[in-house]
C-alpha cells in the first residue's frame, strides 16, 4: 500500500487561493501516511456535501496520483479513502473540543467540522466497516 508525505491538517483554513495559484500553510503536522489521508481530511471536514456530489473527486485524485508514479487501482484508493475518513472522525472531535466555543468563529468552525464529517461518513457508509 502506498504512503507519501502528508500535510495532516488539510482543511480549508490552511489553503489560500490567488490568481489561479494555491498556497498551503501550517505544515507543523507533516508526516508519512496514506495518500488518501489529506484528501479525506479536506473533503470530509471542509467541503460541504453539495460540492462533494459535483464530481468524483476521489477518482480525480487517484488519476493525479497514478500520473505521478503511484500505482494502485481506483477501487483500492476508494477503500483507503473511506478508512481514512472513518479514522479522521477523531480529528473532528478533538479539534471541536479545543475550539473556543464562546466566540462565534470557534463555535461555527466546530459545528461545521463535526456536521460535515458525520454527513460524509454516512454518505460513504463508513460505519459499516466497524464490526460489532
Predicted regions and their residues:
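Catalytic activation segment of kinase domains across protein kinase-like and atypical kinase folds
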Residues: 11-42
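All-alpha amphipathic helical-bundle segments outside canonical DNA-binding/catalytic cores
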Residues: 70-85
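ATP/Mg2+ or Mg2+-diphosphate-binding catalytic cores
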Residues: 88-132
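Short acidic alpha-helical/loop segments enriched in Asp/Glu that coordinate divalent cations
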Residues: 22, 53, 73
Amino acid at each position: 500500500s502506498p504512503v507519501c508525505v502528508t500535510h495532516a491538517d488539510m482543511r480549508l483554513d490552511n489553503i489560500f487561493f490567488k490568481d489561479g495559484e494555491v498556497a498551503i500553510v501550517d505544515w507543523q503536522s507533516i508526516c508519512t501516511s496514506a495518500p488518501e489521508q489529506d484528501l479525506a481530511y479536506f473533503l470530509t471536514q471542509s467541503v460541504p456535501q453539495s460540492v462533494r456530489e459535483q464530481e468524483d473527486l476521489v477518482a480525480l485524485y487517484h488519476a493525479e496520483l497514478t500520473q505521478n508514479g503511484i500505482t494502485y487501482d481506483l477501487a483500492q484508493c476508494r477503500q483507503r479513502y473511506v478508512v481514512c475518513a472513518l479514522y479522521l472522525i477523531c480529528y473532528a472531535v478533538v479539534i471541536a473540543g479545543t475550539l473556543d466555543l464562546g466566540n462565534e468563529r470557534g463555535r461555527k468552525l466546530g459545528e461545521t467540522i463535526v456536521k460535515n464529517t458525520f454527513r460524509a461518513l454516512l454518505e460513504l457508509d463508513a460505519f459499516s466497516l466497524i464490526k460489532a
